Amino acid sequence: IAFMKDWGFDGIDVDWEYPADATQAANMVLLLKEVRSQLDAYAAQYAPGYHFLLTIAAPAGKDNYSKLRLAELGQVLDFINLMAYDYAGSFSPLTGHDANLFKNPSNPNATPFDTDSAVRDYINGGVPANKLVLGMPIYGRSYLNTNGIGQPYNGVGGGGGAGTGSWEAGIWDYKALPKAGATVVYDSVAKGYYSYNSGTRELISFDTPDMINTKVSYLKSLGLGG
């Protein structure tokens, strides 16, 4: 909080990845309540009428968010920034969508997680819809030596640094996508895009401008905060 005061910031965003049990989840709420109290005290003394923001980065994976005290978080926080991305990557056993909106029952391996389930669980858990903010990736996650989405792969490529479009293995800047020779494919059930090159057998999952439009329409329809 002292750092925020010294630099004139508008608030604090807490990124706790992730409370592992009920005790940690309770401690998270206590921490946030204390931060809220100190922000309000600072505002009362130096900026009467001003509301400093308190937000968190929050998981979209059920194993993680099911441990959180959602209703209490919804009360103490201004916004909950949902990390609705990184659903699959180099850490996954199979290729998958990086940030799909929905599950695809006909290809469940491609959608181990989905945004809609997380959003509805947060809301049903007591978080006001207008406090949920949907995170979107501006990069792609790649897989090598694969026959398609939801399939085995071997390697992720990338990581060449400046001028290559990839600063980290398996992750490509949006400006480098789709790569030459790749075909962009839309999964209309999961609501997710990926590119695939049948010659090199490289698959990259990423959000296109059309996908961003779809997500904005989705969050508007549910009254999300942004």
Predicted regions and their residues:
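Substrate-binding surface in catalytic domains of secreted glycosidases
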Residues: 18-174
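Short acidic/polar active-site loop segments enriched in Thr and Asp
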Residues: 10-12, 130, 225
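Extracellular low-complexity, Gly/Ser/Thr-rich intrinsically disordered linkers
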Residues: 177-226
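Short, acidic/polar
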Residues: 1-6, 62-73, 115-119, 206-221
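Mobile, glycine-rich extracellular loop/lid and propeptide segments
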Residues: 11-19
